Amino acid sequence: MAVTDARYPIGQYEPQPYSEAQKEEWLADIQFLPNAIENAIHNLDESQLATPYRDGGWTVHQLVHHVADSHMQAFVRFKLGYLEDNPTIKPYNEGDWVTTSDVQNLPVNISITLLFALHARWYAFLKSLEGNDWDKTIFHPGHEKK
């Protein structure tokens, strides 16, 4: 697989059929991601946190805050999709979000703490879904698809 956009090293998301085993693996990813991020950055100093993770990319500091921001969006989108009939979600400009004062000034441990709480809620919510609940959709106007 040739990578044409370094922002997406594994490629852009394309929905595919999935097995129950794959779903359980994804649920485990959601459950344990905060631990993985915390462990990955635990021994980094401020200089390392201020280092871009790739040429032209965000710093590790920005990336940690971005994960918290994007996962809050994802959690809300899952809830909207569950509670409403194919709701249109609001896209957001991720590049603008990493320039806000909270991202610039707060330590990454704030977003790590947020991720632990958020992922506990998200995982519990997803584990409660049954059968056809997993077939519900949202509409993303930026991608113009469900």
Label for each model-derived stretch:
Residues M1-W58, M72-K146:
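Aromatic-glycine hotspot motif
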Residues H66:
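Histidine-centered divalent metal-coordination motifs
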